């Protein structure tokens, strides 16, 4: 009895401390829900991990990853917005460096690239797998938030005829070299700082994953849109991007698929017919190759069908034995199979709540970079969740996008914890300012009431 009371007391203490955090409580509750769902789902969906590890070992590993993720989130939560802004401007350089190492396929002993499913997307750093594309997504969203806000700040400074404190390199080059004087124009600064980095990153990602490059490109364009980039410039940049992809496609065709192989992978996935009747008449290697191609997406659809309204309940999934990585790319199908359509709808509501709440946080903030960062990160989290769901319900080709904070995967989990940490930090700052404004308003109101009361006494 005493032990139970102590445990209840500890839980209440932990809950009270969490509720005393100054960040947005709704986002905090969403994070807790997603982490709890991930524990439940990963424990139940991992009977056949590639390493053949036990469920207990898997849960220990996931528990350690969750601990690291919460630590990352906690550290970023205490960051000032100006610190996050200062780090964000290096997002493109960091992404460029990581992707360059992938393209060169380095092998330096302690760190080397790793090929998975015919594509190079990861590093092995002293045995730890690092998914570069996950890092690039968040880095580039934060970078674009900085770049657009910096361009706007520079433009405002020039209008007010004062020295700009942002984009110092572009301004210095424009002042020093006559042939680079075009860099004084806001349009060219957007080209150099916003459009070119986005196009370069997406092009470099094509070698590792064409579908990921397209998805990241879409997220970056959407981030630019919510940042207020002129739609005409976005249209031109989009046309340039399409022209670049067309040029790469031409290289793929001219080389008979020997170069830019990932383009062929994207096209093949978009054109795959997941009908099991395609196995008829096939034998040997062709039969097994086609079976492997069809098994996962077909089993994912079967899982959704068998889930029906209320699902099979925890631990009763059967399709997890058919889909080897259901804990990653097909986590939503697994959740629907075990918890039914209602469970699937709850997952949708949770991710939509992230977007809705982030809109409120963005409006609360008076810092331009903070508004863009919250909007872009929320768009990334929700967009990836819905891309994952679309693939699971057969509304799109396989992309390898995981379900944020639920699917198994260390790199993705830590990166999205960092994204949520930034959102919480910005919400904390915005809430502090609102609270200060409310206190000032209340103080002014009290002062007015005191003055009125004093005036009435004098009249009496």
Residue map of PLM features:
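Interfacial segments of multi-pass membrane proteins
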Residues: 214, 220-233, 318-343, 401-414
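Hydrophobic alpha-helical transmembrane segments
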Residues: 64-72, 136-137, 338-355
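Hydrophobic alpha-helical segments of polytopic membrane proteins
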Residues: 69, 89-96, 172, 189-206, ...
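Membrane-helix boundary/helix-loop-helix interface segments in multi-pass membrane proteins
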Residues: 2-27, 40-41, 45-207, 389-403, ...
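Alpha-helical transmembrane segments of polytopic integral membrane proteins
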Residues: 36-42, 141, 145, 352-355, ...
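Hydrophobic, glycine- and aromatic-enriched re-entrant/interface helices and adjoining loop segments
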Residues: 114-122, 235-344, 368-369
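Loop-to-helix entry and N-terminal half of a specific, functionally important transmembrane alpha helix
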Residues: 360-400, 406
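Alpha-helical transmembrane segments of multi-pass membrane proteins
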Residues: 34, 99-102, 146, 205, ...
């Amino acid at each position: 009895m005493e032990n139970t009371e102590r445990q209840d007391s500890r839980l209440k203490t932990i809950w009270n401390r969490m509720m005393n955090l100054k960040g947005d409580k709704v986002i905090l509750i969403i994070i807790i829900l997603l982490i709890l769902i991930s524990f439940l789902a990963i424990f139940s969906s991992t009977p056949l991990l590639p390493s053949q590890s036990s469920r207990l070992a898997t849960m220990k590993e996931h528990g350690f990853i969750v601990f690291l993720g919460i630590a990352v989130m906690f550290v970023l939560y205490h960051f000032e917005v100006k610190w996050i802004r200062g780090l964000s401007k290096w997002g493109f350089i960091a992404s460029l460096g990581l992707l360059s190492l992938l393209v060169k396929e380095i092998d330096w002993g302690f760190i080397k690239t790793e090929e998975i499913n015919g594509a190079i997307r990861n590093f092995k750093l002293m045995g730890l797998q690092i998914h570069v594309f996950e890092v690039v997504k968040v880095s580039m969203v934060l970078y674009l938030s900085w770049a657009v806000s910096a361009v706007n700040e520079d433009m405002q400074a020039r209008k007010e005829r004062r020295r700009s404190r942002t984009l110092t390199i572009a301004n210095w080059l424009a002042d020093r070299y006559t042939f680079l004087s075009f860099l004084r124009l806001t349009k060219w600064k957007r080209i150099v700082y916003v459009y070119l980095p986005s196009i370069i990153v997406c092009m470099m990602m094509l070698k590792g994953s064409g579908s990921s490059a397209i998805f990241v490109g879409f997220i970056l364009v959407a981030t630019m849109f919510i940042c207020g980039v002129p739609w005409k410039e976005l249209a031109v940049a989009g046309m340039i991007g399409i022209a670049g992809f067309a040029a790469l496609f031409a290289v793929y065709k001219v080389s008979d698929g020997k170069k830019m192989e990932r383009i062929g992978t994207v096209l093949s996935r978009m054109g795959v017919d997941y009908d099991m009747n395609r196995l008829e008449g096939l034998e040997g290697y062709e039969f097994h190759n086609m079976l492997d191609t069809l098994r996962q997406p077909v089993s994912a659809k079967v899982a959704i069908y068998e889930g029906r309204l209320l699902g099979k309940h925890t631990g009763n999934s059967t399709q997890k034995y058919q889909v080897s990585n259901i804990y990653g790319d097909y986590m939503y199908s697994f959740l629907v199979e075990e918890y039914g359509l209602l469970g699937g709808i709850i997952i949708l509501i949770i991710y939509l709540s992230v977007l809705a709440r982030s809109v409120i946080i963005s409006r609360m903030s008076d810092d331009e970079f903070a508004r863009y960062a919250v909007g872009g990160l929320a768009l990334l989290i929700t967009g990836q969740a819905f891309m994952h769901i679309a693939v699971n319900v057969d509304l799109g080709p396989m992309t390898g996008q995981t379900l944020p904070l639920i699917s198994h995967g260390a790199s993705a989990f830590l990166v999205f914890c960092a994204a949520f940490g930034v959102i919480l930090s910005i919400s904390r700052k915005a809430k502090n300012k609102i609270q200060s404004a409310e206190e000032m308003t209340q103080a002014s109101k009290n002062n007015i009431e005191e003055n009125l009361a004093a005036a009435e006494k004098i009249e009496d």
